[in-house]
Amino acid sequence: YQFLLLKALKELNNPSYDITPEVITMYVSHILECLYNNEKISVADFASGSGNFLINLAALSKGDYELTSVDVDNNYARLQQNIFNLLETNVEIINQDALKPLNIKKQDVIISDVPFGYYADEDNSLNYKLCSAEGYSLNALLFIEQAANYLNDNGVGVLVVPKKVLELEDNFKKFLEEDINLNAVITLPDEMFKNASQQKAIILITKKDQTKLPNQVFLAQVPSHKNKEGYANFIEEFKNWLSEK
């Protein structure tokens, strides 16, 4: 699968096309296993790109996932269709801007490796509480808000975001106080990034009044997956945190 995907991306010849590293998918898969213990759940990716995140998640997990993939890029949508058909994986593929209204049911889990940079549609960004007061709005903040919009009452957003986004602009602080819970911030290993400005974190978000996760924020840095003992300890700490709710 990875070979076919990389070959297809090379043929599309667009330098902006990239895939979510498999190790990040592994981390998210383990988090979902801790949360849902292989229950049947609905999972949507709102920035699915090549579909790599979803397909690796389905392959790595023992759970039964009802998958929905959303991406604005036509080439990515066609690529996903071909690869998911080849792998005989049932996925609903929606080819549209994920920050526009979506005709999908509320989800148990929403994942996204959210895009860097700014959202080009200033008019649509005005529909979001996390839009910028002036100029273009950050993609990451809008994706966080949109994920919250489509979670069911006890759903969990598991989002890979630039860590610098968490330096909390005023409107994000207000959004956290009034609209959602930021339940966990899990910083990815430093070695995965060329410099500090590129560093990412996995965040867990839920709606107010949810009962799925503890409200006390879980803060951690994931050890390298090569450090098996350290990684096992991280998973144990995460499970202990879950038991506190």
Listing of model-derived features with the role each one plays in the protein:
Residues 1-61:
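Class I S-adenosyl-L-methionine
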Residues 197-245:
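Flexible, glycine-/basic-rich loop-and-beta segments that form/coincide
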Residues 80-81:
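Conserved SAM-binding loop
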Residues 114-143:
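Mobile active-site "lid"/loop adjacent to the S-adenosyl-L-methionine
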Residues 66-71:
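Conserved SAM-binding motif I beta-strand of class I
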Residues 88-98:
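Conserved SAM-binding strand-loop segment of SAM-dependent methyltransferases
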Residues 100-111:
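A short acidic, Gly/Pro-enriched loop at the edge of an enzyme's catalytic core
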Residues 136-191:
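Conserved Class I SAM-dependent methyltransferase catalytic core
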